[in-house]
């Protein structure tokens, strides 16, 4: 839970920096890799060999993909995701949820008690 919470923090922190630095010429990219062949697996007690090999990306491929995403202007790069539209739809839904919460009053379903 600490690992996934940290990833969530890094994503949101990076998004905040992207907004704050939008017109400064400084670009912030956040990379969200899936399983990557690093020592982290063994350190965490889950041997890399326990993962399906086809789901694990090499560090070299991860770095190349992250740099390609940066060169393409991606603010969020998911190195193993072929259909970036999945992320875009998720991100749009996230933004819509945030906007829908800005009503200043309780939702009607919560007042009908």
Q: What does each of the following model-derived ranges do?
A:
Residues 27-37:
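Conserved SDR Rossmann-fold cofactor-binding beta-strand/turn motif
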Residues 16-27:
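Active-site-adjacent segment of SDR/Rossmann-fold oxidoreductases
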Residues 1:
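Cytosolic ligand/metal-binding cores
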Residues 6:
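Active-site helix of classical SDR
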